[in-house]
Amino acid sequence: MNPVDLIIKRAYPYETEKRDRIYLALNENPFPFPKELTEEVFRKLEGDKMRIYYDSPDEELIEKILEYLDADFLRENNVSIGNGADEIIYVMMLMFERAVFFPPTYSCYRIFAKAVGAKYLEIPLTKYLKIPEVDVGEGDVVFIPNPNNPTGHVFEREEIEKILKKGAFVALDEAYYEFHGESYIDLLKEYENLAIIRTFSKAFSLAAQRIGYVISSEKFIDAYNRVRLPFNVSYVSQTFAKVALEHIDIFKERIEYIVSERERMKKALKELNYSISDSRGNFVFIFMDRKEQNKLIEQLRQKNIAVRSFREGVRITIGKREENETILKELEVFR
């Protein structure tokens, strides 16, 4: 078969929707990147640095990431960056013999595996949302979002270590770390077959700038840097990230707001007798069969509200309070 036809047959595009409504489908931060910080970025940008192939990553950004991580065992050669966390995941699909993941999980794991023609294994989480028994070893990369996406629940440390001890490489996707506040980053001191993936998209309102970072052993980072594209993150994006890290307190205040709204939403949904997960992300997840989902999504569509549907239920991004109130009222009517 023609290679182009083969790709079209096996892979499918990641599709997005118009934003002409209350859009609570992609776990975006409800707050815009602060205007005063955008102005600071523009003041810092230098025309001469625009014309060159800018270092990716630049040393100053790595230093600021290390300061943010506040882990004294990490050094500059333990960190690299990607064009969004997605590029890091995509590159890792190319680095290993097989990808393993546990649905319900981040949909791009499967999308990227199919796009690059990688071997992959999907084994559903148990009914209690635990990682199932799986036969893995060297050559496998196991992708685990923690908190999980789309359910938002957190995996136990023992579940992660069980896979690490089998020799497989674990990519712990901590895209929603800031909304949970706890990390297994200390496991890097014991396991070289572990990488932590983070992003500036969620907590820092920088999804459009496409910048993520990966923390791992010096050996893995060296290998990753050899496979990723050179100059993969723009000078502008790196400058936005550096400025964000210089003003952490602004974002901490916003994170507290989102977490408070998440907990309020969870409480309200329980009072409405919805079955929900214990989400620690910037979203809530309602378990719901397809028939119910279709009815709910149609009702929300008529009210110009978009959420995300999965086989197991519906994920709703935490928006600003008025948006959350609007969807809670619709969920009360639906109930």
Curated annotation (Swiss-Prot):
Q: Which reaction does it catalyse?
A: L-histidinol phosphate + 2-oxoglutarate = 3-(imidazol-4-yl)-2-oxopropyl phosphate + L-glutamate
* Enzyme's top EC category: transferase
Instruction: State any GO BP term from the record.
Output: L-histidine biosynthetic process
Which residues get modified to N6-(pyridoxal phosphate)lysine? K202
Q: Which pathway does it serve?
A: Amino-acid biosynthesis; L-histidine biosynthesis; L-histidine from 5-phospho-alpha-D-ribose 1-diphosphate: step 7/9
Q: Which GO terms describe its molecular function?
A: histidinol-phosphate transaminase activity; pyridoxal phosphate binding
Cofactor(s) required, per the database record: pyridoxal 5'-phosphate
- Record key words, sorted: Amino-acid biosynthesis, Aminotransferase, Histidine biosynthesis, Pyridoxal phosphate, Transferase
Query: Which EC number(s) does UniProt give?
Result: 2.6.1.9
Give the Pfam families listed for this entry.
Aminotran_1_2
Q: Which PANTHER family match?
A: HISTIDINOL-PHOSPHATE AMINOTRANSFERASE, HISTIDINOL-PHOSPHATE AMINOTRANSFERASE 2
Q: Which HAMAP family match?
A: HisC_aminotrans_2 (MF_01023)
Q: Subunit structure of this entry?
A: Homodimer.
NCBIfam families in UniProt: hisC (TIGR01141)
Q: What family does this chain come from, according to its entry?
A: Belongs to the class-II pyridoxal-phosphate-dependent aminotransferase family. Histidinol-phosphate aminotransferase subfamily.
Protein name from the UniProt record:
Histidinol-phosphate aminotransferase
Q: Which organism is it from?
A: Thermotoga neapolitana (strain ATCC 49049 / DSM 4359 / NBRC 107923 / NS-E)
Lineage of this protein's species?
Bacteria, Thermotogati, Thermotogota, Thermotogae, Thermotogales
